[in-house]
Amino acid sequence: MPNSRNYTRRRVLSVAIATAASPASVLSLDAGGLSDRRIVAESRFDVTSAPLQAEVVQLVVDFPPGAWTSWHTHGGQAINLVLEGEITLRHAGMEHPHRAGQAWTDSSGEVHAAGNTGRGKARLLTNFLLPPGCTQTTAVQESPFEPAIAYEVRFPLSALPAETEIAQQVADLASGWRAQRASVGFTANIVIAGEVTYQIGGERKVYQAGEAWSAPAGTLVGEENRSAGTARVFTTCLLPRGTGR
């Protein structure tokens, strides 16, 4: 059975220290045309100490111009994907700008902060992978103008293989889109705009923006946009290294 949760809010956002991104593979579908499903952004990284990970977190965070996180550390690996605008990462006296479509990851405890130095809104998608008992965020110095967490969901993880990758993908689903697939690895999915109907195993439900589900590897998932408008989904998959989605 899928796990389904609405978002909760937290005051402090963690953002990780930068490394280069690598592209994620395209989701394999058995119905619908490619024009009906548009990949907006994606990333793929190795998971650090995969067998130790006990929880996955999905965050959708909005940065108004001038908003910055606290200076902070985090207790597990963070994977970050800029969806809109530009996010600047500060650490060790350096600044690293990341534009829409760029991603980075880190599992270090180094103190850092991230913010929006541009004129328009920025949106950041973050995954945390947390071992048992680890704190998601530890603030060192508070920010006077924090970004806003739009959505946050978390799901427990079963034991992962030592060689595991995490793939993030944001896709727009046109009205009338319909597809079915079997999940290759553990999958967590949150609707971030519009609504999508999912058939997950034996359960069928309409998911609104901010609602999420997870399913283990091998679960048959049906996906359908029955609304009049385009829907947007943020999907995280934990995959054996080298496999497609």
Label each residue range with its predicted role.
Residues 24-41:
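C-terminal segment of N-terminal export signals and the immediately downstream linker at the start
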Residues 75-92, 184-201:
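Glycine- and acidic-residue-biased ligand/ion/polar-headgroup-sensing regions
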Residues 2-20:
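N-terminal secretory signal peptides and thylakoid transit peptides that target proteins
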Residues 57-73, 107-108, 165-183, 217:
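Conserved short histidine dyad/triad with adjacent acidic residue
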Residues 92-109, 202-218:
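Short acidic-glycine-tyrosine-enriched beta hairpin
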Residues 68-70, 88, 104, 108-115, ...:
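Histidine-centered metal-chelating micro-motifs
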Residues 109-135, 218-244:
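Ligand-binding loop in jelly-roll beta-barrel domains
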Residues 134-160:
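Surface-exposed beta-loop interaction hotspot
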